[in-house]
Amino acid sequence: MQLPTFLEVYEGLISTSSISSTDPSWDQGNAKVIEKLATWFKDLGFHVEVIEVESGKHNMIARMGEGEGGLLLAGHSDTVPFDEGRWSFDPHKLTEKDNRFYGLGTADMKGFFAFIYEAVKKVDWSKQNKPLYVLATCDEETTMLGARHFTTNAPFKPDYCIIGEPTSLVPIRGHKGHVANAIRVTGKSGHSSDPALGVNAIEIMHEVLFAMMQLRDKLIKEYHHPGFAIPSPTLNLGHIHGGDSANRICGCCELHYDVRPLPGISLDGLENMLRSALQEVEAKWPGRIDIVPLHEPIPGYECQHDHPFIGGVEEICQTSSQTVNYCTEAPFLQQLCPTLVLGPGSIEQAHQPDEFLSFDFIDPTIDVLSKAMVKYCC
């Protein structure tokens, strides 16, 4: 059987749209790209299972070899939406120009599966003693649905995991989490000529904002991680809107904020800190303050710096591991085994018009992955 080339796999991935979005008009599901991946890895000798997580949303688990432990190579099969007017190329066509691959998902991160595919072909598997797994998840760009489902229902426990997000081939051992909420204040509208007729939601929100800024200062004062460029959690007040007219008492005001917690700060603990910060305001204005999540919260993640897995991958890559501020599926997969984030391309290209991956990453990435397969499976 003639196996597809690296370029053919890459082209097939990029040409198969798999956008996930909280906007139903954009959301497509990933069934078609998972079907392609399943076929390719079956032809390569893997045992493949496709799991429907929700309607139109699928994970793929591929396994080569038997036994306990082994190495899991993971990534998400979905992409973000795109602004067609800002692209110079067809987002759903792999374009080669100026020693780059252009296309939606070239860096973030469908292209990673083409690198896995090619690396498998380079390895002598006659001495394999532990399994190699490949996981392709759904909805990383929205709810992390695929990673959450896999972690809860994992049919195996690998020794180690590498997630192929674009890190410029630098091993990432930790990142902050992400929590985004809306605080909605409900007042009572009325004519501005008589403030006693209503309850001004903006005035209540003023008290909420003061409490949130106190929480921000508390997070900076009490939590510190020297491994991060920004060593404390961050709290950002990102969006606020209230009222509809200068001559009307504001009946509703809404604030959107986010927190990026450090590894080790539990989501429950962060929620308790928020409730404590707002306790006095809520007691003063009972029933008028609601907190609504904008998305499922993502905890911080860290693979312990002295873990031998980090040293082994640093040796393969010939570079030291780092921490970053953006989020991946690592907090979930880390629940199963020591996990690192490591892949081709730059995070600066993610979610951008004319997303690309430089040809400079091709050979080094295949080399790194094939060495990892040998080290942890053979």
From Swiss-Prot:
Its cofactor is Zn(2+); Co(2+); glutathione. One of its GO terms (biological process) is L-arginine biosynthetic process. The lineage of its organism: Bacteria, Pseudomonadati, Pseudomonadota, Gammaproteobacteria, Vibrionales. The active site is at residues 78, 140. It is found in: Cytoplasm. This is Acetylornithine deacetylase. GO terms for cellular component: cytoplasm. Binds 2 Zn(2+) or Co(2+) ions per subunit. CDD domains: M20_ArgE (cd03894). GO terms for molecular function: acetylornithine deacetylase activity; zinc ion binding. Pathway: Amino-acid biosynthesis; L-arginine biosynthesis; L-ornithine from N(2)-acetyl-L-ornithine (linear): step 1/1. Zn(2+) 1 binds at residues 76, 108, 165. Zn(2+) 2 binds at residues 108, 141, 351. Belongs to the peptidase M20A family. ArgE subfamily. Catalyzes the hydrolysis of the amide bond of N(2)-acetylated L-amino acids. Cleaves the acetyl group from N-acetyl-L-ornithine to form L-ornithine, an intermediate in L-arginine biosynthesis pathway, and a branchpoint in the synthesis of polyamines. It comes from Vibrio parahaemolyticus serotype O3:K6 (strain RIMD 2210633). Homodimer. InterPro entries: AcOrn-deacetyl (IPR010169), ArgE/DapE_CS (IPR001261), Bact_exopeptidase_dim_dom (IPR036264), Peptidase_M20 (IPR002933), Peptidase_M20_dimer (IPR011650), Peptidase_M20A (IPR050072). Its EC number is 3.5.1.16.
